[in-house]
């Protein structure tokens, strides 16, 4: 792994070039397997772990927060052993779609942050994302709410995910004009089979405001690994394969073939 770190503006937060996503923790990965993945990631030089309060509410028997709880247990366990200290691991989580904390009203953002901190067993998170937009809220209210968490010491840096480029620009403009904590990173869907929006809208926006860019679904839900080439491949992995089905097109398979040629 490239051990070089990327600074999130002037926030003091630095993240690895490859962030570990925690959306499977408590879903397809139990505590023991999740701990093994986290240990291996840190041992390889990684320092940033991404989760969300909603992970993994969609799984039968879950209610949301399972990933945060596992991550919190891992941090606590490593603090009791020779593992990495809290300051060595950048923790990112998100707000907006947890069943009990839907939306980005100031009251909800504050309450959801406190709930996430409790599950994680922390007094602050390094990076707090608006997970999805809330059209019922003006951007000004959301920007104020996130900045207030930074002022309170509960959040070190603000991130935006799944907002339109226009709403992100409005947020960044408002934060700059009102001396608030500015969004330091944007996280959007981006991979070799879905490039247009990220390259055409979000990358120029990030450059304009000095935001770091981070992609999710970088492997297109596993499609870019080449393991999904037929409908039968999708059916054989029902837990994860269904999300990759939309890429199973002649265009998508052409990308797989081109990738195989250069891999």
Spans of features found by a protein language model:
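Active-site mouth loops of central-metabolism enzymes
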Residues: 21-32, 95-107, 136-137
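Beta/alpha (TIM)-barrel catalytic core signal, keyed to glycine-rich beta->alpha loops juxtaposed to Asp/Glu
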Residues: 133-263
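Short, acidic/polar
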Residues: 30-41, 104-120, 168-173
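Conserved, mostly hydrophobic/aromatic
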Residues: 8, 20, 34, 49, ...
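A short acidic, helix-capping loop that chelates divalent metal ions and anchors anionic groups
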Residues: 55-60, 98-102, 224
């Amino acid at each position: 792994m490239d051990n070089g770190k990327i600074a999130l503006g002037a926030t003091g937060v630095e993240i690895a070039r490859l962030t570990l996503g925690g959306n499977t923790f408590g879903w397809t990965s139990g505590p023991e397997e999740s701990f093994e993945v986290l240990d291996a990631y840190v041992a390889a030089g990684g320092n940033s772990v991404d989760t969300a309060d909603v992970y993994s509410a969609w799984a039968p028997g879950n209610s949301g927060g399972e990933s945060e709880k596992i991550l919190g247990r891992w941090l606590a366990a490593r603090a009791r052993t020779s593992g990495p200290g809290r300051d060595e691991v950048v923790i990112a989580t998100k707000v907006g779609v947890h069943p009990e904390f839907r939306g980005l009203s100031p009251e909800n953002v504050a309450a959801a942050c406190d709930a996430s901190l409790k599950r994680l067993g922390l007094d602050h998170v390094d990076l707090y994302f608006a997970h999805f937009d809330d059209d019922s809220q003006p951007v000004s209210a959301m920007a104020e709410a996130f900045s207030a968490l930074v002022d309170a010491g509960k959040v070190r840096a603000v991130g935006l995910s799944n907002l339109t480029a226009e709403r992100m620009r409005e947020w960044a403009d408002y934060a700059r004009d009102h001396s608030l904590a500015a969004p330091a990173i944007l996280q959007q869907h981006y991979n070799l089979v879905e490039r247009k929006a990220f390259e055409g809208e979000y990358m120029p926006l990030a450059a304009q405001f000095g935001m770091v860019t981070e992609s999710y679904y970088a492997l297109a839900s596993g499609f870019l690994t080449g393991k999904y080439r037929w409908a039968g491949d999708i059916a054989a992995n029902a837990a994860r394969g269904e999300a990759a089905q939309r890429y199973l097109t002649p265009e998508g398979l052409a990308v797989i073939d081109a990738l195989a040629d250069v891999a």
